[in-house]
Amino acid sequence: MTNSSAATDQPSLDVPTLEAIRATRKRLGELVVTTPTRPLMDDAIANAVGASTRLWLKEELFQRTGSFKPRGALTVMLDLDAAALARGVTGVSAGNHAISLGYSARILGTTAKVVMPKTANAFRVQVCREYGVDVTLVDNVAEAFARVRDIEAAEGRTFVHPYEGPKTACCKARTGLEFIDHLRAPGEELDAVIVAAGGGGLTAG
């Protein structure tokens, strides 16, 4: 069986253009939601940063599945041809990416097989399975990546990386574009952006 790695979102130094980001935004359409941006109202934080500083939150917890991860999974999967999509996808995750693969596979009419470390949150594992994900639990992340490569080779599934690749960066950049668009309306100007980082996929965008 042909290995599907050529179809995956391979790491690249290419920086997504604004045109590409906007095209990705249009392509995803209503498969993801434009999450709200709201001012942070907290007296303790206001005292810490000073009264003249306004803090805004981009609330990705209101994204479908509860995290920003579907943005990347859907962008990669929408680029698959019909045969690759029919074979399904695979991935490594401790939770949010696995859930996003399940969500994406369901709405695109395919299947997902995910390898997760045994330390993954039990509730997240349950949510994955409720989405129809075939979950395999292993001892650690290194073993998970090795196992998922075996699945990719044996079944022809496309490996969707949890945070690397130009397509993933491009779709995550949509989050930043939404953020800027939201702040233009009240006439705010950004001095700094603080981004929580795990694998770095959101930060890359």
Put a short name on every predicted segment.
Residues 1-205:
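PLP-dependent amino-acid enzyme catalytic core
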